[in-house]
Amino acid sequence: MKDFIFRILAKLYPMNLIEKLAYYKYVIQSYRISSRLGACGKGTRFSKVDYLTGHQHIHVGQNTIFLPHLFLTAWGEHDDSIKISIGDYCSIGAYCHISAYNKVSIGNHVLIGKWVSIVDNDHGETNKESLMIPPLERKLVSKGPIVIGNHVWIGDKVTILSGVTIGNNSVIAANSVITKDVPPFSVVAGNPGKVIKVYE
């Protein structure tokens, strides 16, 4: 009986129709998100965004793809300043979290894996007075902007912290924690991340 019902449903809703409906839903959802941003280039597509705040402070280039379950948070004043800038032809993996209080700048042709955190801020200073305040009530602080150059490949589950610049054409291995600047043409791995190879 169950097989019979599935056969009927398959005829009523052929795969090409389901795929078309899914595609149109994707396009509409993507337009709804991109139209809220400070700027967004042609051909950029968003899948499901779980959390978006400070959208007016977020600028994205053209032909960049965002995979599902994205967290984009730009904390700032009610002005037109750019807090998160993402270039052209980038791919942002599923479950990524990009958060800027100072600024996060990502170049062109950057590939970012799944479960990556790029966060330039913390909840308060690490002194006794701050630690006595509930974390959510502490003022956000940043040690500096995060700058990621062009043609950078960032593996799954990487964490990039504030005040870091990653040079062009670098590779960040999966599970790395980046706390210091990365020179161009470098391969970095580990926690904390260390340069294991530089291509001259």
Predicted regions and their residues:
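Glycine-rich hexapeptide-repeat left-handed beta-helix
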Residues: 106-200
